[in-house]
């Protein structure tokens, strides 16, 4: 059932005044800057971490004002903004341009969100040194953390970057940059062997120093197990159920700005909100209160 269908609509309307203690409010984005220690504090307190994509100054400022802790300048911009068939064609200079736009948007409103930027396809696999050069481009554009996709083979690169002062978010499960090798956008880790591999890769990435780990299109039970096994690396789920330390969605998807079939793991928060800000605030509250995602509707 599409996430925007009627049975899913009622719980995710305009945020109510009765947010849980410690939850972000619509003005939370103006608070103290989010940092890695702050994200660790949220997890230790049992509060979910919220992340959304943004590709320009205006949407970044809106997400920050609505209380989103982490903004991801994702290479999904290739499909969302550039009309590419996948993320494979996204270039490093494009990622730097959009990272700078988002950073300026946050600076303009004295925002507090933590800014993560994707290392695009072909910008880090050749060598650790190539990865560092690429990461420097994004960090100098305003990113505070870089994200890279891949399993155990990326662990040495993660360690190399972290040792040189570059915070890293890893990414397992469905890795869109490998869509051709994976044979399409399919759930990963469904078999016993696949689940064992993902568990092992997650441990290797934590040991290498990854501070965050995106788990995409992974069975909910497996994502929960991985999360419980990683005390020092905070999992961010997308299509991975409610048991991760946080959630991320593509902004355009959760606003209903999708011309194709809505992914199973998405809910259209705009349909019950009166504004973009209201939709994002509703997403933040639904995640914080544990109402989104609903494993029965949005997970495998």
From Swiss-Prot:
Co-factor note (free text): Binds 1 Mg(2+) ion per subunit.
GO CC, alphabetical: cytoplasm
InterPro entries (UniProt xref): Pantoate_hydroxy_MeTrfase, Pyrv/PenolPyrv_kinase-like_dom, Pyrv_kinase-like_dom_sf
One BP annotation, GO: pantothenate biosynthetic process
Catalysed reactions, as listed in the record: 3-methyl-2-oxobutanoate + (6R)-5,10-methylene-5,6,7,8-tetrahydrofolate + H2O = 2-dehydropantoate + (6S)-5,6,7,8-tetrahydrofolate
Cofactor field: Mg(2+)
EC numbers on record: 2.1.2.11
Cysteines joined through disulfide linkages: none
Binding, 3-methyl-2-oxobutanoate: 75-76, 118, 147
Annotated residues for binding of Mg(2+): 75, 118, 149
Catalytic EC class: transferase
Protein localization: Cytoplasm
Annotated pathway: Cofactor biosynthesis; (R)-pantothenate biosynthesis; (R)-pantoate from 3-methyl-2-oxobutanoate: step 1/2
Molecular-function GO term, any one: magnesium ion binding
Chief location of this protein within or outside the cell: cytoplasm
Alphabetical list of HAMAP family matching this protein: PanB (MF_00156)
Function recorded in the entry: Catalyzes the reversible reaction in which hydroxymethyl group from 5,10-methylenetetrahydrofolate is transferred onto alpha-ketoisovalerate to form ketopantoate.
Family classification: Belongs to the PanB family.
Name of this chain's protein: 3-methyl-2-oxobutanoate hydroxymethyltransferase
Source organism of the structure: Verminephrobacter eiseniae (strain EF01-2)
Gene behind the chain: panB
């Amino acid at each position: 059932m599409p996430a925007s269908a009627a049975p899913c609509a009622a719980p995710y309307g305009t945020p109510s005044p009765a947010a849980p203690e410690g939850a972000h409010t619509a003005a939370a984005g103006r608070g103290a800057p989010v940092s890695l220690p702050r994200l660790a504090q949220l997890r230790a307190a049992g509060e979910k971490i919220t992340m959304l994509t943004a590709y320009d100054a205006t949407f970044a400022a809106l997400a920050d004002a609505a209380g989103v802790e982490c903004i991801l300048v994702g290479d999904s911009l290739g499909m969302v903004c550039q009309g590419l068939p996948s993320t494979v064609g996204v270039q490093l200079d494009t990622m730097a341009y959009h990272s700078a736009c988002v950073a300026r948007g946050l600076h303009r409103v004295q925002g507090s969100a933590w800014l993560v930027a994707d290392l695009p396809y072909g910008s880090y696999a050749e060598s650790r040194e190539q990865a560092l050069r690429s990461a420097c481009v994004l960090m100098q554009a305003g990113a505070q953390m870089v994200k890279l996709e891949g399993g155990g083979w990326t662990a040495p690169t993660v360690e190399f970057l972290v040792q040189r002062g570059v915070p890293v978010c890893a990414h397992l499960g469905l890795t869109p940059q490998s869509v051709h090798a994976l044979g399409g956008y399919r759930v990963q880790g469904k078999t016993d062997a696949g689940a064992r591999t993902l568990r092992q890769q997650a441990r290797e990435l934590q040991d290498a120093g990854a501070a965050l780990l995106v788990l995409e299109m992974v069975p909910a039970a497996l994502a929960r197990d991985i999360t419980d096994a990683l005390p020092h690396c905070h999992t961010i789920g997308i299509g991975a159920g409610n048991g991760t330390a946080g959630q991320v969605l593509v902004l355009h998807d959760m606003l209903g700005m999708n011309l194709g079939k809505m992914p199973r793991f998405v809910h259209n928060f705009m349909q019950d909100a009166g504004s973009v800000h209201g939709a994002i605030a509703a997403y933040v509250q639904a995640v914080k209160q544990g109402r989104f995602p609903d494993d029965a509707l949005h997970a495998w």
